[in-house]
Amino acid sequence: MHTLVFCSFKGGTGKTTLSLNVGCNLAQFLGKKVLLADLDPQSNLSSGLGASVRSNQKGLHDIVYTSNDLKSIICETKKDSVDLIPASFLSEQFRELDIHRGPSNNLKLFLNEYCAPFYDICIIDTPPSLGGLTKEAFVAGDKLIACLTPEPFSILGLQKIREFLSSVGKPEEEHILGIALSFWDDRNSTNQMYIDIIESIYKNKLFSTKIRRDISLSRSLLKEDSVANVYPNSRAAEDILKLTHEIANILHIEYERDYSQRTT
C-alpha cells in the first residue's frame, strides 16, 4: 500500500480538495481501493465525503494517541472503493502539540497492520500547521505531496518542509513525491518567478499539471462528491485527473487499460 501525505503550512492551498479528488479519481478511474484519512481537526475531508463527525467520534487522533485496536473507525463512503478514517473533535486539542516530542508510530503501525492488506493507496490529509499531528503523518507516510498556491507566503513555506522532514529523520529528496500548484491562472505574469523559486528549493519536484481556478471545485464539495463525478466537463475535473495520472505514473501504479480509457 502506498501512503501519501498531502500537506501545506498555511490554509487555502487546495490541500483537502486535492486529497479528496485525487483519492476518488484513483478509485473511479484507475480501479484502486483507496483509504482517505482525515487528520485535520477542521474535518473538511470528512465533510466533503458526506461523513458527519460526532463529538464522540473516534478518528485518527485516537490511533495516534492510543494503542487500542481501532479497526472499527474505518467508515465506508458513498463512493465505490473509497473508505474513510474520519477526523475526531479531540484532535483539535492536539493541533499544536509539542513538535519536539517523539512520534508514537501508532499511526504507521495501524496503517501497516490493519490497512495495507486491504487497500492499494492511503491518502492522509494533514492540518495546515507544524504540530504533532502533522509529524505523525510524516512518519507514517511513504511519500509527501506539498500543496501550494502561486503566492509568496505559500511558496516560502517550502523551506519549512525541509526543516520538518529533518526533524523526523526522512531524506527530503526521497520523501517528497511532488509539489502541486492550485489556483493557477495562466495569465499571471509572475508564474515563471514562482516556478523558478520552487525549482531552486526542490529541483524537478513540481508536478507538470497545474490546477486552474474553477468554481466547480467548491460547488462539488457542497454536493459532497468529487468534481469529476459532479462536473465531469469542468477544467478542475480535467486538471485533477491529469494530476492523478501523473502521481500514479511516478509511483509506478499499474491500472487496467479500461480505466485509463475512461479519462478521455
Curated annotation (Swiss-Prot):
Q: Does the keyword Nucleotide-binding apply?
A: yes
What is the annotated role of this protein in its UniProt record?
A: Required for growth within mammalian cells.
In its miscellaneous comment, the UniProt entry states: The sequence shown is that of plasmid pLGV440.
UniProt cross-references to CDD domains, sorted A to Z: ParAB_family (cd02042)
Q: Which family does it belong to?
A: Belongs to the ParA family.
- Originating organism: Chlamydia trachomatis
Keyword Nucleotide-binding present in the record's keywords: the answer is yes
Supply the Pfam families for this chain: AAA_31
InterPro entries noted in UniProt: AAA_dom, DNA_Partitioning_ATPase, P-loop_NTPase
| Name recorded for this polypeptide | Virulence plasmid ParA family protein pGP5-D
Q: Which cysteines are joined by disulfide bonds?
A: none
Print the organism lineage: Bacteria, Pseudomonadati, Chlamydiota, Chlamydiia, Chlamydiales
Record keywords, A-Z: ATP-binding, Nucleotide-binding, Plasmid
State the Gene Ontology terms under molecular function: ATP binding
- Which positions, given as ranges, span the membrane? none
Q: Where does ATP bind?
A: F9, K10, G11, G12, T13, G14, K15, T16
